[in-house]
Structures are given as C-alpha cells and as structure tokens.
Amino acid sequence: MRYGEKEIKEFDVENMEIWPNDAKNDYIIKITLPEFMCCCPRSGYPDFATIYLEYMPNKFVVELKAIKLYINTFMYRNVSHEASINEIYNTLKDKLKPKWIKVVGDFNPRGNVHTVIECRSDMVVPK
C-alpha cells in the first residue's frame, strides 16, 4: 500500500486536526477542493465534483491536510451527491462550530445532468 492510500484509509474523522483561531477579526476562509470523488450508490460509477467550502471561523479552523484527507475518504464510498455534501457540511459544522458555513458540491455532468448541492448555515426557504 502506498503512503497516500495508507493515510486516507487510516484517516479518522473523529481525530480531524483542527487549530485554534487566534484572529481577533471576523473573516471568511475559502477552500476549493477540485478533485472530489465518490461512487454512485446505484451504479457504482465514479462521480466527480469540485467542493467549495467557505466559513467564518469562531474558535477553530480546519488544518488543510486534514480537510484534504477527509475529502479523499469519500473516494470509494457509495454515496449520493446529496448525502456526501450534507455529511461534509454536518461534519465541519460539528467539528469547527463556525459562525457561518457553506459547502457546495458542483458535480461534473453525467448523462447530461449537472448537479449542484449547497448546504449553508443561513439557509432560507425560497419563496
């Protein structure tokens, strides 16, 4: 097993590395993860997406290697677009307890269908 495969396989989301946020100002962190992959729970075919993470930290920030490894754990999981983005959102919201957070999954088209899933802490039902 190669070292990257080993790191992904052994990654434990319960021990995701987070750091204290020492900044006194409010600010937004924007992270783009352009190589997200999961497998369709129906067909098993791979689905690819770019994940856009934005959050206003409170007391914690996520360490960048930790978010990379966490995202890579989805690589061989059979999970829907909706479930994967909601899981990422809930995990980061629970771990970081940010003042505000948004996670967007912009999935590559498959079968002429383009899906974008967005979860955000200030979600309002559209009228």
Curated annotation (Swiss-Prot):
Designated gene of the protein: queF
Similarity remark: Belongs to the GTP cyclohydrolase I family. QueF type 1 subfamily.
NCBIfam families in alphabetical order: QueF-II (TIGR03139)
GO BP annotations, alphabetical order: queuosine biosynthetic process; tRNA modification
List of residues binding substrate: V62, E63, L64, H81, E82
Name of protein: NADPH-dependent 7-cyano-7-deazaguanine reductase
Originating organism: Campylobacter jejuni (strain RM1221)
One Gene Ontology term of the molecular function aspect: preQ1 synthase activity
Catalytic class of the enzyme: oxidoreductase
One Pfam family hit: QueF
EC number(s) given by UniProt: 1.7.1.13
Active site, per annotation: C40, D47
Annotated function: Catalyzes the NADPH-dependent reduction of 7-cyano-7-deazaguanine (preQ0) to 7-aminomethyl-7-deazaguanine (preQ1).
